[in-house]
Amino acid sequence: MKYLLILSLLLVSAVLAGAPARQPVQESDPEVIVSKSKKKVTRDYRNVFPVKTIAVTTPASYPHSGANRLGVEMLKKGNYKVKVMPHTFLDPATLKNTNRKAHKGYASIPVEMRLEDFYKAWNDPEVEMIICSRGGNGCFELLEKIDWNKLKKRPEMIFMGYSDVTLILCKLLEKEGYARPVAGPMMGSMTGLPPAMITGLKKMLSGEKVGPYKVTPLVAGDCSGKAVAGLLQRFATAKRANYAIPTKGKIIFIEGVSLSAARVKQELLDLKKMKFFDGAAGVVFCHFTRTKEGKEIGKVIKEFAPSLGIPVYTGFPFGHTAKHQAMDLTRTAEIKNNMVIFPAVKK
């Protein structure tokens, strides 16, 4: 028996030795950018943001990843005064009767708590910038409850986020003068953002020239206009809710995450039917990630592009990926000779 036991252990060891190495589990939060470095993750955000005080708040899903907290620490090490709102990292699992969505990782605390933090961050006169901890699901619910009369108009205050936060950015574009909307990285994105993208973020916020970035024409043509940037499915949600998103004369940058080709096609057709693209100067399709239908999505976009009757491009670095160039939605973008640039802001 002893001999058989030893033999069995040797056989198991041999099988395990020949087995492929276990692959790392994909981060459940698609907004988290995982650093490829094996060393301790660190990013230098000193002098990146043109402010002294930054507020961090959670408008939607609970930021469960450790990367979200690490992002806060990186801001602190960047010599910013960081005000983390009281409920930012409150785990909904510790509360009774909270929204525990069946889809893992998208639970959120009650909207009343999120709303309280939102008001607190916004109306704090010391806060010069608000960065969302993450998106997920829940911004639409928050916006349904916001009393805009309780928010001060702060056109110089930067409000940054993307993904589900696209909804808030759309509302800020509609309500011009409330804040300076920026489609850009959130707490979980900070930890793995490449140095080149951090430089691009700094230049975008400071008004310096950004680019050029090479893009691929689907419908050729030069164009210019202020940027409107966000998540495809949230643009569709906003239009269905009758948000008055100002796209006339602007360049629309669109990204997607966890979408099938059929869903992309339907959302694009719906947006066209709802006149989202009417009067736009151009459209740029960015990254579509976390999908097994990348080629099919590319085909859908290629077939859809000519129907818009305006210049259409693909390949700009924006979305749920490390290649994430933040975009200030108050700044003008230009596309010329298949290159995207944001000209320096005249002061």
Short names for language-model regions:
Residues 9-16:
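Hydrophobic h-region of N-terminal signal peptides that target proteins for export
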Residues 287-347:
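ATP/nucleoside-binding phosphotransfer catalytic cores, i.e., glycine-rich phosphate-binding loops
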